[in-house]
Each structure stands twice: as structure tokens, then as C-alpha cells.
Amino acid sequence: MGEIEGTYRALPTSGTRLGGQTAIGVSTLEPEQSLSPRMQEKHMRIRVKLLDSTVELFDIEPKCDGQVLLTQVWKHLNLIECDYFGLEFKNVQSYWIWLEPMKPIIRQVRKPKNAVLRLAVKFFPPDPGQLQEEYTRYLFALQLKRDLLEERLTCTANTAALLISHLLQSEIGDYDETLDREHLKANEYLPNQEKSLEKILDFHQRHTGQTPAESDFQVLEIARKLEMYGIRFHMASDREGTKINLAVSHMGVLVFQGTTKINTFNWSKVRKLSFKRKRFLIKLHPEVHGPYQDTLEFLLGSRDECKNFWKICVEYHTFFRLSDQPKPKAKAVFFSRGSSFRYSGRTQKQLVDYVKDGGMKRIPYERRHSKTRTSLHALTVDLPKQSVSFTDGLRTSASLSSANVSFYPPPSSSLSPPGLPNLKDSSSSLVDPQAPVIKSTAAERSSGPSSSDGPSTQSAHLPGPPVLRPGPGFSMDSPQPSPSSLKSHLSLCPELQAALSTAEQGASPVLSPVLSGAGTARMDNQEEQKHKHMPEDEAYFIAKEILATERTYLKDLEVITVWFRSVLIKEEAMPAALMALLFSNIDPVYEFHRGFLHEVEQRLALWEGPSSAHLKGDHQRIGDILLRNMRQLKEFTSYFQRHDEVLTELEKATKHCKKLEAVYKEFELQKVCYLPLNTFLLKPVQRLVHYRLLLSRLCAHYSPGHRDYADCHEALKAITEVTTELQQSLTRLENLQKLTELQRDLVGVENLIAPGREFIREGCLHKLTKKGLQQRMFFLFSDMLLYTSKSVTGASHFRIRGFLPLRGMLVEESENEWSVPHCFTIYAAQKTIVVAASTRLEKEKWMQDLNAAIQAAKTIGDSPPVLLGGPVYTRTPRSSDEVSLEESEDGRGNRGSLEGNSQHRANTTMHVCWYRNTSVSRADHSAAVENQLSGYLLRKFKNSNGWQKLWVVFTNFCLFFYKTHQDDYPLASLPLLGYSVSLPREADSIHKDYVFKLQFKSHVYFFRAESKYTFERWMDVIKRASSSPGRPPSFTQDCSHHSPGLEAEIREKEACPSPCLDKNL
């Protein structure tokens, strides 16, 4: 097959992929041409070491700016995506400095004639798929090769061996033990690489048939998941004098202690970066620092070091976050303050547009390999054209094919003003319908020397498109706990991905105003060719569900172990004894699950990756990992059993310590605390139940003769023993958490937590008053019925209106008496009230729970419930047929203290029940534990045919939306109480597979899953917790509408309180 125009560009150097160093530089002068003596005075030769270790000589004028040299280098290499690269040199202090384009070289480089500058990657994008040129990815792979050798890219021995094996495949071709050993003996990839020799050879055997382009992509794909990917340390110290390392990445400024990341200051949180002498200053936005200091200070070694790091931060921020370079400030007439430095190159957005629009003619280049061997697999396979598919794993197919692939990096965030204020998150990679089609060919590999080989070409499959995910780590607003609790494991398994289509024509859809910066993938509405490379075994999808939910679970634990701990340490608000009790019981659990997640990620990577096609199925299982870890969980039973003690002591401490109470309330208002704080204390025990359910599905899927069945069955037995032992503890813990949450949210009530009191149901009913039917929030407990009204002061708390003891209570239907649909009468010892439910099913659920609770209350002692601080009704007893018409309550009476609570979260079940006119029972909350799910979904834009990729977490009857699974807090939420889930109808014009529809009144959303299994799982869990938890299917139509008679009495409420997806979209 002949060479395809525009695929390869000729490397004008003699450097090879083997990395052999060239002893002499190559001049840019023509052969036999020399400079005249006069010209030699006006020119100087500068040596530049390229990424393949060859040295080039460039002739420039002594007083020219750095941009002149850079332009010569880019032209010499025919490098299109040149803005990712730069030239660096060592200064007097022997640390590396980037050559500034707008400054004369002689003012930067000392003795430039003797200096050796080197080409290096300057900006590391979070995803290699954002690099559109194969040649650019090749240079990035060479940079990572250099970083490995210089020990900048620190990683485990296994990961280093895997990286080197892909570099070997790229440079010398398919595995040959003799040649591999000779090559590794002659070339150093890693210090002391002899220790990893056998691992390298073992990994290399698995890459048979992999082309150089695919190997490059695999190197980038593995490296970008390492915490040290693209990190360049700058030694510093904090205000206390602690030695730290500062670094900068696409996401913001990073703080390390040793090689452990302890803090991340995202660009969106930073208001301004500055330096003053040796001090580097980070000013945060007011909403980030809150009551804490708004300026963080770090001390570097010298003013030059500090200014150098500041310049790098400015360049990184401009390149990744802005659409265009900021305009230069006007020069001061008399005096100027501060540095005039600014980034002078193109931003990533501008570079993307330039390459997309054709920017520069692509000149073919050849990959010349010495001692390479022919890969029959790569040379014989030639599949038809296919569209890009977002699949899991290391995105290359086991069967290579020729493919038409369009890579399109992210759209930029909205234009920001010069400097650093008002920063917004940038989007991730998109597939653009108009992006140019790139066809790749692989140079023929032969067994002879490269000098005698002719460059024949063959179609090869480009690595798959990008998965959107930010750099590793999590952002923090304050100093962190011990570094041991923050160590990061290698994650080889990427997140769930969704199939995206490409088209040759048509404009990209417009991003929705909300979540536009969060979208991680976009699709056009044209017909899509499907070609997904992922295992089809249901066990694989169950394993991937374990991975996805484990990632969410670990993030939930970090809310306490990292974020809450950080605030407590900073404020010194918690007694030492309570702090020891809290973290001694949750830290070991957190560390265990970090290790477990690491194992699952690596297993899934091997299961999904291209190497799995050459194995005998040893890695296409998960039971051995589950069995080992489920058995270890037994050792943590004592920790799980003490969580109710932790919750009780925490509640007592907040009552007696005003400072702790203030810190607690303030922390709950932070975005990272997306659920009530005490809810996260339930997660460890609830996760055990989830393991049991997942293992049950695995055992049901496998036949008894399957190699993984025995391990899964034993793991199920082990976790069942643990959950059985902890069942009473979980029930007690869930009840205690609910009572604690209600006591915090209800105004005018104290001592709600009482021995023997159990929560039964909460929900919205309409109470008959002198004004007619008034909406009230009712709470049914094992000893009383409590009802509240929403505050009219703008706060989202509920104020106690009254309570009725269950002893002696009687409940009767009274629709005929009052002519109000779905109403019933509650007769208490001293009061009678008439209430109406929104539907027949709601009425039946309330009456059933009330009657059951009344019967159970007969066995409780005679002591009345104690509720201090709320209005207790002590009116004269009335006859059983007399109805109490509630006074005009909304205009008078003490409202209680609500200061500081106006921002209270509005997606709790209490608030959602209020707005959706529904109710939730204790059984529903317990069932919700079994209906938790995480993963990537595509959300359809409202006003276009585009799809937006989001990480979605379903918990506590609510969908939470993130850009990626590594985000610390959700961008939006959608409570699902009251929603119905169904398949799209023909009128919806949705022509995609695995799409489900969510609807509540006029609010309609479409979501798309990546496979049949995930589609069915999302449908299943949402059905169980949508319109009304626990609803029988036969009641679907009856419950979805209010009764006509009641509509006149009930004012239509907004579907969902802000913040939520309803209101924003």
C-alpha cells in the first residue's frame, strides 16, 4: 500500500527511535557553505539538543530575541503543535530556565556560544488525545523517556517496566529476547534498569503487533495517570518553615511534601498570583477562603527562583485557561510597578483552532528503525473505516485496523480578563465533526539494518480518542493531614467512556449555558458507526461497576478524612479525645479501600487493554481480588461497630462546644460536603451491603464451572457474614443519623434524639386550617407525629408547629365528610387535625405507617415525648368529633434563630419532599443504600443534538453531576423523587441506543449509557427510587398527577429548589 499524503512527515535529522546519540551537531547551512568572516561576527551558533538526543546547530544574530531561535527549531522539525514545547537552559545556579521568546538571547543565556539548550515539553495537557499530531505524541513519548531516565517521572517498578516495554515496542518492534537484551544493554531507560529487566521483557511480549504510533499513545496514556506526570519541582517552604515543593499543572498550583501531593489550588479558586522578593503569594477568591486567610505565602530560595516560578504559573494559566493571550498593559508614563512579563505564544484554544483549520501543510515523515522486525499482525489487518469510539481501558484495540480518526481538543473556557481573576474551568476534549481526518501508516519493519531498508507503508490503527479527566489529586483549601493518608496509587484503568460519533461536515452543537464548562464530550446528531472495543462479558461490566462505585466511595471518605480533618486541625475546634475517636475508626478503613481501589484499577486495565487478547484469560476475572479483600474486611468489624458511638459523641460535642458547632455548620455549606456531614459516617457500613449485592450478581452470572465462580462464592460468604453481624448496628446507625440530621434542620426542637425513638416517615401533607389547605411537612416517629411549616424568612429550615403523641391516636378516612380528595383525620388525645395527601398512594402509605406505629406505641411506656424549645399545644381537651382549625400561623409567632442558615442545602429528602409533594419512609432510606450507582453518562443538550459527557453519582435519591470522577464536588444535582423514567418515544427524535428519559411535569432530560448492561443498571436503580420510592408498578399512572379536586387548594410548587439541575438547565 502506498504512502498516504499528510500522514507522515520526513524527519530531516538522522536521529532514530533507538535514541542513539549523535556525536556532532548538524548545521543549518547548505553543504560546503561557510560564513564569511564579516558574517561570522554578526552571527553566532547555538547548540540545541533535541528530544532524540541529537544536537543541532542554529545560526542566529547575537542580539535577536528568543523567538527567532524558537522559530528556526520549529521550522527545522516541521513541528505544527509547537506551542506545547520550549527551549530550556541551565542558569548559574544550575536549575533549568525556559527561554523567553520576547527577550534577547544574550540577556538570558550566559555565554550562549558555549551553552547547550535543549528542546523539552513545556505544557503537559491532561489527556494525550488532545495532541492531534502523531509526531507531537512521538516527541511527548521521548520527553517521558527522558523523564524516566532523569528520575523526574517517579513511579512503581511495574509501571516503569510497562512504560519501557512500550518504548521498546516503538523503537525495535515485536519481542525478540536476544535483540531486546542487547538493546537494553546498550541503551539506558532507567537507573538500575537491570533489576527490572525480566519485567520489561515480560511486558514487551504482550505488545505483539502494536505499531509505533500506538506504542507512543500507550506511553502517554499510562504516564498521564501518574501523579508526577509533567511535574517540575521548585523547592520552597511555608510560613512555618516546613520544606515543601511547588509545581504547576493545567489544573492549578500544586503543593508537595516530598513526592506526596498535599494541596491543589485550582485556577478557579485563585484570584491573583504574585511575588515579592523571595515570597510567592497566592490570593484566593472570597468564597474559597471564607473566614480563613485569603493569601497564602511560600518562601523560595531566591528572588530569581521565585520570579521564574511565577512566570511558569502565568504561562500555564494563560495557555490552558484563556481563549486568547491577555492584551499587554499600557506602559506607565513615569513609573512602572511589577513585572511586564506575559505569555506571548498561542493558547491551547488558538492552537487547536489553527491545527483544525489546516494551519500548516503536513509533510510526510518516516520512522526509520534499526533492527526492527516485521509485525505480521500489523501488516495484514486492514479493516474498513470506522468512527471514533470512547471505550474503556488503554484505548487501542486488540485487533488493529485502519481508521479515520478525528482528534479535537477542548474548547476554551469563556474569555477571562488579563491576569488571574474570575477564572472558570476549562472544558475537556471534544470530537469535532469538522476536524480534519488523519490517516496513519506504519513504516514497514524488517529484520535488516535500517540503512538498507526502504520505507514501505501500511495502514495502521491510531490509538483511540481521549478520555476526559484532569490530573490526579484533589484540591484543598487548607493544610492537609499526614502525607501517609494522601499517598496516590497508580491508576491504570480509565473511567467509563461513551461512544462518540464523527461527521465530515456540520457545525458543532452549542454548549448549554449551564455545565458548559463541565462537558467532557460532545456528539453530533448524524448517523454513528459503532465499533466498540471492550469485553462483552457481563462480569466485566459488574467489575467496572465495582470500580466506579469504589471511586465514589473513596471520595466520600475523603470528605471526612481529608477535608473535614483539615478544617478541624486549622481551627482546633474539636476536643482531642473526640478527634482520636473519629479518625482512629475511619482512617484504617480509608487506607484499606485505597489499596483495594488500586488493585481493582490495575485488574480492569489488564482486562480491558490490548494485551488481554494475547493472554489466557488470567486477568479477565475479579473474584480473586474480591475474595482476598472481603476476608480482610472482617478485621474491620470492630471499627464499623463504633461508628454509632462516633456519631453520638460528635452530636454531644457540637451541643456543648459553640466553636465546633460553628465549624460543623460552616463546613456543611462547602461544596465538597454535598450531603449532610453525618451521612458520610454511614458510608463504610453501607458499602458492605453494596459489596454483597454486587457479589450476588457475579455469582448469579457465573456458572458453577467458571474459574471465577469459586472465589466469588467464597467472597460472598465472607461479606455476608460481616453484613449479618453488622445489620443491627447499621439499622441503629441509620436511625441515629436521621434523627441527628432532623434535629439540626428543624427550628424550635431539642432532644429529638431520645432512647427508643425511631424515625418512620417524612413527607408533605396539606393541613386544613382557617385559611384552607396549608402545606405542612410531617415527621412520623415511633412515639409521636410532628408537623412543621417552612420559614417565610427566606431560610430553608422548617419550624415546629406542633406534635401529637401516638398513644391513644386514631386515624380515619374522611373524604366524604370534607369533600377533599385523599384526606384523612387524625384524632389525638388533645387535638384533631384533617390532612390531605397529594395522591391515593401517598394517603395509603401514611395511614398504613400511622396505624402500624400506633399499635407499636401501645407497648411504649407512659412518659410523654420531651421536645424543648418548640411551641407545645396545651389547649382545652375537645370532643372526638371537634376539628381543630389551625390559627393563621404564617403571619405571627417566634420564628427561631435562623442566622447563618440561609444557604442550607436544598436537595435533602426533607426539602425535595416539600417541593415534590411526596414522602419517604425509613424502609425507602434503607432501600436507597442498595440503589447507589456511579459512572459516565452522556446528557443531551436541551437546544441542540449534542451530548455532554458527565460523571454521574446516584445516591440518596439524587443524581449528582461532575466533570470527571476526580472532581471534589458536584457541578449540579437532580433530586429524582417524583421523576418517572422511561424509554424515549418516537416524538422525542432520539436516534441513539441505550438512552433513557427522565421526566417530572415539564422537566425532561435524556441520558445515554455506553452499553446495554449499564443502561439497564441505570434504569433499574432510578426506577426503584424515582417517582415515589417503593411504589408498585400498578400505581404509576395514579401517582403521577394530582387529583383535580385538590389542585384548586394546592398551589403548584417549583419542581426543585436551587441549586439543582432542574433550575439551571
UniProtKB/Swiss-Prot annotation:
Q: Which GO terms describe its biological process?
A: actin cytoskeleton organization; cell adhesion; hair cycle process; neuron remodeling; osteoclast differentiation; podosome assembly; Rac protein signal transduction; regulation of integrin activation
Q: Which Gene3D superfamilies match?
A: 1.20.80.10, Dbl homology (DH) domain, Phosphatidylinositol 3-kinase Catalytic Subunit, Chain A, domain 1, Pleckstrin-homology domain (PH domain)/Phosphotyrosine-binding domain (PTB)
Residue ranges of the region described as Disordered: 406-489, 504-534, 874-902
Phosphoserine is found on 389, 440, 863, 880
Q: Basic and acidic residues bias: where?
A: 524-534
> Which tissues show it?
Detected in adult brain, lung and testis. Detected in embryonic hippocampus and brain cortex.
- Enumerate the PROSITE patterns for this protein: DH_2, FERM_1, FERM_3, PH_DOMAIN
Q: Which InterPro entries match?
A: Band_41_domain (IPR019749), DBL_dom_sf (IPR035899), DH_dom (IPR000219), Ez/rad/moesin-like (IPR000798), FA (IPR014847), FARP1/FARP2/FRMD7_FERM_C (IPR041788), FERM/acyl-CoA-bd_prot_sf (IPR014352), FERM_2 (IPR035963)
Q: Which UniProt keywords apply?
A: Guanine-nucleotide releasing factor, Phosphoprotein, Repeat
The Low complexity compositionally biased stretches are 440-459
Report any Pfam family annotated for this entry.
PH
Any one GO molecular function term: guanyl-nucleotide exchange factor activity
Question: In this protein, which residues make up the domain named DH?
Answer: 538-729
Q: Locate the PH domain: which residues?
A: 758-855, 930-1027
Taking every annotated instance into account, which residue ranges of this chain make up the domain FERM?
A: 44-324
Subunit details: Interacts with PLXNA1. Interaction with PLXNA1 or PIP5K1C lowers its guanine nucleotide exchange activity. Dissociates from PLXNA1 when SEMA3A binds to the receptor. Interacts with PIP5K1C via its FERM domain. The interaction with PIP5K1C is enhanced by SEMA3A binding. Interacts with RAC1.
What function does this protein fulfil?
Functions as a guanine nucleotide exchange factor that activates RAC1. May have relatively low activity. Plays a role in the response to class 3 semaphorins and remodeling of the actin cytoskeleton. Plays a role in TNFSF11-mediated osteoclast differentiation, especially in podosome rearrangement and reorganization of the actin cytoskeleton. Regulates the activation of ITGB3, integrin signaling and cell adhesion.
Print the domain comment field: Intramolecular interaction between the DH domain and the PH domains can stabilize the protein in an autoinhibited conformation.
Q: What is this protein called?
A: FERM, ARHGEF and pleckstrin domain-containing protein 2
Q: What is the lineage of its organism?
A: Eukaryota, Metazoa, Chordata, Craniata, Vertebrata
